[in-house]
Swiss-Prot record:
Core subunit of respiratory chain NADH dehydrogenase (Complex I) which is composed of 45 different subunits. Interacts with NDUFAF3. Interacts with RAB5IF. Found in subcomplexes containing subunits NDUFS2, MT-ND1 and NDUFA13. GO terms for cellular component: mitochondrial inner membrane; mitochondrial membrane; respiratory chain complex I. Residues 1-35 form a transit peptide. It is an enzyme of class 7 (translocase). It catalyses: a ubiquinone + NADH + 5 H(+)(in) = a ubiquinol + NAD(+) + 4 H(+)(out). Its EC number is 7.1.1.2. The gene is NDUFS3. One of its GO terms (molecular function) is NADH dehydrogenase (ubiquinone) activity. It comes from the Eukaryota. It is found in: Mitochondrion inner membrane. The keyword Membrane applies. This is NADH dehydrogenase [ubiquinone] iron-sulfur protein 3, mitochondrial. It comes from Pongo pygmaeus (Bornean orangutan).
Length: 263
């Protein structure tokens, strides 16, 4: 009995504190949305729009923005009922901690962490955190941004799963994560130069690896292209049926042209 009263008192205290932080807005609770299974012949090929879930996620996004106005810059719900929250880079730890620990959120699983390179932007890298709430069967996508030189605070202190994800982003994109316990390359080889997923990284790379029969080991050499510019408008010597290639005369005629007489 005493434990039940204590739990009720603690929930009331949390609700009061959330109400105070939300500037008078009542707490918004994510409710699990049940999806009824359809038959094999009527099952849609794409996920249908759920208006109830869409309104609920939109209200929860506004609730998060009012509680954390210092960090949340934009909130939107995608067509597939996924909430996207765009935050300032300084708000990575506070926002992720709030979404993980808040009673009405409980996004305790970091499903994926990746980056997007858009060179035309001033802050060319977009860092994307995909979170999952098993309690409410809901997903949320947290986005932030940075450039080549500005580090992002590591999320390992909030989600242990971010360790290797951040190492992969550092290896592929060159985004530095501050306070990471072991930030080093994870996919490329030792001594690799550059970051392959950057849009300005050359398609051929900088070095090529091959096995040298003389030294009996794998060696790395600068890339040497025998032909810098290649024109592909030619007959391939490996073409199996060159005689069956469509002649220019039988190509599609323009409107008003007459068909040439057959010889």
């Amino acid at each position: 009995m005493v434990a039940a009263v204590a739990r009720l008192w603690w929930r009331g205290l949390l609700g009061a504190s959330a109400l105070t932080r939300g500037a008078g807005r009542p707490s918004v609770l994510l409710l699990p949305v049940r999806r009824e299974s359809a038959g094999a012949d009527t099952r849609p090929t794409v996920r249908p729009r759920n208006d109830v879930a869409h309104q609920q996620l939109s209200a929860f996004g506004e609730y998060v923005a009012e509680i954390l106005p210092k960090y949340v810059q934009q909130v939107q719900v995608s067509c597939f009922n996924e909430l996207e929250v765009c935050i300032h880079p300084d708000g990575v730890i506070p926002v992720l901690t709030f979404l993980r620990d808040h009673t009405n959120a409980q996004f305790k699983s970091l499903v994926d962490l990746t980056a997007v390179d858009v060179p035309t932007r001033q802050n060319r890298f977009e860092i994307v955190y995909n979170l999952l709430s098993l309690r409410f069967n809901s997903r949320i996508r947290v986005k932030t941004y940075t450039d080549e030189l500005t580090p992002i605070e590591s999320a390992v202190s909030v989600f242990k799963a971010a360790n290797w994800y951040e190492r992969e982003i550092w290896d592929m994109f060159g985004v530095f994560f501050a306070n990471h316990p072991d930030l080093r390359r994870i996919l490329t080889d030792y001594g690799f130069e550059g970051h392959p997923f950057r849009k300005d990284f050359p398609l051929s790379g900088y070095v090529e690896l091959r096995y040298d029969d003389e030294v009996k080991r794998v060696v790395a050499e600068p890339v040497e292209l025998a032909q810098e510019f290649r024109k592909f408008d030619l007959n391939s010597p490996w073409e199996a049926f060159p005689v069956y290639r469509q002649p220019p005369e039988s190509l599609k005629l323009e409107a008003g042209d007459k068909k040439p007489d057959a010889k």
